[in-house]
Curated annotation (Swiss-Prot):
Broad EC category: translocase
Name of the featured protein: Spermidine/putrescine import ATP-binding protein PotA
Gene that encodes it: potA
Location of the protein in the cell: Cell membrane
Keyword flag Glycoprotein: no
Length: 327
């Protein structure tokens, strides 16, 4: 797949503070790439440099192999969608969507045709004459997205666009955004701190921490094969266990809990259940390993967990193939 954007040893300093140390990243044409990390990790700063709202202190940004460090945002063929929609309150949906085209003096007939298609893709046709105050938060976000795609950008940049929405609406819009990206075939670069959001939508995820890239991979690679201690603790839940000079990670769904009356494998240790948590379709057991004193998490179905009570002695263990060695 062709690389549309290249970030080459880019740094960002604010005064004497280094926000992003040298960082390199290739972004493929037509992919849904998510930059994921905690607050303050540099993900939004990186997005703003790609968009042209911040200038790299060092290094180069390339679009189609052409340097764009000093190219103004409006010449980059990219559009940016924020968490706060910045819609014009006195304009209806259709006029909000057409505003950018009007400023570019796009012929009126073409404006209408392109706005019609953008509203169709974002399910806004029935709301075309409504003003923002008459729309829900999700509908307003759809208008912001329609306004961003109507100019046919090469790249759509999204900075935590669903952060202000409630859980169900956020889930609905996640599916819509992914379907929209597939239909348009353009590159989406999405910034979020929400790991579930990143996992459900992305072709690839860039995990950032303190300005560094910790790992790049598909959602399955990031979840099943975390490379670093940070990724293992930030993405989902993991049991982190000391192993010689380093650590291994074991997902709770791979930890087995057995009765002390069963024949047991030598790799299993004696432990006792300290707590049981109901987590929807599963129950989470907290088991104290008597040998290592580690507190281990294990997921079980409600039916499996029904046999246990807090304080029960059990055997706890896992298959060696389920261990992931961490850097």
């Amino acid at each position: 797949m062709k690389k549309i954007i290249k970030v080459e040893a880019v740094e960002k300093h604010f005064g004497n503070q280094v926000i992003i140390p040298p960082l390199s990243l290739d972004i493929k044409e037509g992919e849904f790439l998510t930059i994921l990390g905690p607050s303050g990790c540099g993900k939004t700063t990186l997005l703003r440099m790609i968009a042209g709202f911040e200038t790299p202190t060092k290094g180069n940004l390339l679009l189609d192999d052409e340097k764009i460090n000093d190219l103004p945002p409006y010449k980059r063929h990219m559009n940016l969608v924020f968490q706060h929609y910045a819609l014009f309150p006195h304009m209806n949906v259709e006029k909000n969507i057409c505003f950018g085209m009007k400023m570019q003096k796009v012929p009126a007939a073409e404006q209408k045709e392109r706005a019609e298609e953008a509203m169709r893709l974002t399910q806004l046709l029935e709301f075309r004459n409504r003003k923002p105050a008459k729309l829900s938060g999700g509908q307003q976000q759809r208008v912001a997205i329609a306004r961003a795609i109507v100019n046919n950008p090469r790249v759509l940049l999204l900075d935590e666009p669903l952060g202000a929405l409630d859980f169900k609406l956020r889930k609905d819009l996640q599916r819509e955004l992914k379907n929209l990206q597939r239909n348009l075939g353009i590159t989406f670069i999405y910034v979020t701190h929400d790991q579930e959001e990143a996992m459900s939508m992305s072709d690839r995820i860039v995990v950032m921490n303190k300005g560094h890239i910790e790992q790049i991979g598909t959602p399955k690679e990031i979840y099943n094969k975390p490379k670093t201690l940070f990724v293992a603790t930030f993405i989902g839940e993991n049991n982190i266990v000391k192993n010689g000079e380093g650590y291994v990670a074991i997902r709770p769904e791979n930890v087995k809990v057995r009765s002390v009356e069963e024949p047991i494998l030598k790799e299993y240790h004696l432990g006792h259940i300290e707590d049981i948590e109901f987590v929807g379709n599963m129950e989470k057991l907290y088991v104290r390993d008597e040998k290592t004193s580690e507190l281990l998490m294990a997921y079980q179905t409600a039916e499996e967990a029904a046999q246990w009570s807090i304080g029960d002695n059990v055997y706890v263990g896992w298959e060696q193939e389920d261990e992931v060695t961490l850097n």
